[in-house]
Regions:
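Acidic/His-rich, metal-assisted hydrolase cores and their charged scaffolds
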Residues: 1-234
Length: 234
């Protein structure tokens, strides 16, 4: 990507993915490009990561967004949020033409360095289409291997369970098929059925004196309002 790009390179990633920031910084240095962290979350996460020693770079390699926009376009990389097509992110605003600091133009190369999270396909591909309509070349996982999963493999999950030896396990953040497989892995490494709580969102889990019990499920989720009593919309 860096070899082929003739103009600006805009890399969209998660603001919390420090390892990807490091990769971009190192690659940009090899290609004699300066890097700018765009947006508050990206800037703050990079600052904190550097202070804690998780992100390593020379101060001279990083420039402000204002400096980057005034430099030759083949000498800069802009790190932005919005790899999941979020409409209020920097990349989302670039796609919609609503970003007030700079826009997308012919010659820009935009890299979406993460695969769409299940359920996010529509906003991601909508953003890609709109960026291309504005003249950018968009690189994403379907056409080039720019994505590496940030999720642990099954063997890594087993290793973590061996190291931590948790008293209880509550698989979260995934579809039921994923949570159930997580439970199977825990059983394989020696955990007991009663140590694992496989629950749906809204289920109360209580811990009293170190013991886990399951309570009732609180109704939740989306609430749709039809607006019938709100009045006409002009």
């Amino acid at each position: 990507v860096f070899y082929q790009a003739k103009g600006r390179i805009i890399v969209a990633t998660f603001a919390s993915l420090i390892s990807r920031m490091q990769q971009v910084l190192e690659t940009a240095k090899r290609h004699e490009r300066k890097v700018s962290f765009v947006g508050l979350s990206m800037t703050e996460n990079a600052r904190i990561a550097k202070e804690l020693g998780y992100l390593n770079y020379d101060e001279s390699q990083v420039v402000s967004t204002e400096q980057a926009l005034s430099m030759p376009e083949n000498k800069v990389v802009l790190l932005v949020t919005g790899s999941q097509g979020e409409p209020t992110s920097i990349l989302g605003r670039l796609a919609n033409g609503t970003n007030n600091r700079f826009g997308v133009k012919e010659g820009d190369t935009i890299v979406l360095s993460s695969h769409p999270i299940p359920g996010n396909e529509e906003p991601v591909y909508r953003a890609i289409n709109r960026l291309m309509e504005r003249g950018a070349d968009v690189v994403y996982e379907a056409i080039m291997p720019v994505h590496v999963s940030g999720h642990a493999s099954q063997e890594e999950i087993k290793l973590l369970l061996h190291l931590v030896k948790p008293r209880y396990l509550i698989p979260i953040h995934g579809e039921m098929r994923m949570l159930r497989q997580h439970k199977r892995l825990a059983l394989e490494v020696g955990m007991e059925e009663e140590q694992i709580a496989l629950v749906q969102n809204g289920r109360i889990i209580e811990f009293t004196h170190g013991e886990m019990t399951l309570g009732e499920r609180i109704p939740g989720g989306y609430v749709f309002v039809d607006g019938i009593g709100v009045g006409d919309v002009d």
